[in-house]
């Protein structure tokens, strides 16, 4: 059994802030935990514009706090998000998140991230294998 709190991972190597300061991700479960997925609490700043493309991962996101827009860049669709909204990027969609207010979300990645990934110029995380 693994038990962790966000308080104990705050300001550790599991607490990642984007280079532009727009988002912060507390990576609660990572690939090294060997459970087949990773689990993060991510906060995105109000008024920011954030483009992502998880070409190597499926991501499920549940919005706990905040409001904003999710723009599906592959299908030209815009979704209004609020507390209780969920979106699943099961088609590796390129997308943009535009928070109207600060957004706090819980995210699950499969395959799991290791915690060392950095978005490249296209917003993509590389696929990093976790040793068995």
Swiss-Prot record:
Record's keyword terms, sorted: Lyase
GO biological process, one term: ectoine biosynthetic process
Catalysis: reaction(s): (2S)-4-acetamido-2-aminobutanoate = L-ectoine + H2O
EC class name: lyase
S-S pairs: none
InterPro entries for this protein: Ectoine_synth (IPR010462), RmlC-like_jellyroll (IPR014710), RmlC_Cupin_sf (IPR011051)
Molecular function terms, GO-annotated: ectoine synthase activity
EC number, UniProt record: 4.2.1.108
Associated pathway: Amine and polyamine biosynthesis; ectoine biosynthesis; L-ectoine from L-aspartate 4-semialdehyde: step 3/3
Xref: CDD domains: cupin_EctC
Pfam families in alphabetical order: Ectoine_synth
HAMAP family referenced in this protein's UniProt entry, alphabetically: Ectoine_synth
Similarity-based family: Belongs to the ectoine synthase family.
Reported function: Catalyzes the circularization of gamma-N-acetyl-alpha,gamma-diaminobutyric acid (ADABA) to ectoine (1,4,5,6-tetrahydro-2-methyl-4-pyrimidine carboxylic acid), which is an excellent osmoprotectant.
Descriptive protein name: L-ectoine synthase
Organism: Rhodococcus opacus (strain B4)
Gene: ectC
């Amino acid at each position: 059994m693994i038990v962790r709190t966000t308080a104990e991972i705050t300001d550790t190597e599991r607490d990642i802030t984007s280079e532009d300061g727009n988002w912060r991700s507390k990576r609660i479960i990572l690939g090294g935990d060997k459970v087949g997925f990773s689990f993060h609490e991510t906060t995105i700043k109000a008024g920011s514009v954030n483009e992502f493309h998880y070409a190597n991962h499926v991501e499920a996101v549940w919005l706990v706090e905040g409001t904003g827009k999710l723009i599906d860049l592959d299908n030209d669709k815009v979704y209004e998000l609020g507390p209780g909204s969920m979106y699943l990027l099961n088609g590796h969609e390129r997308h943009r998140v535009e928070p109207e207010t600060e957004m706090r979300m819980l995210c699950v990645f499969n395959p799991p991230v290791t915690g060392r990934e950095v978005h490249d110029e296209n917003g993509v995380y590389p696929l990093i294998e976790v040793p068995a």
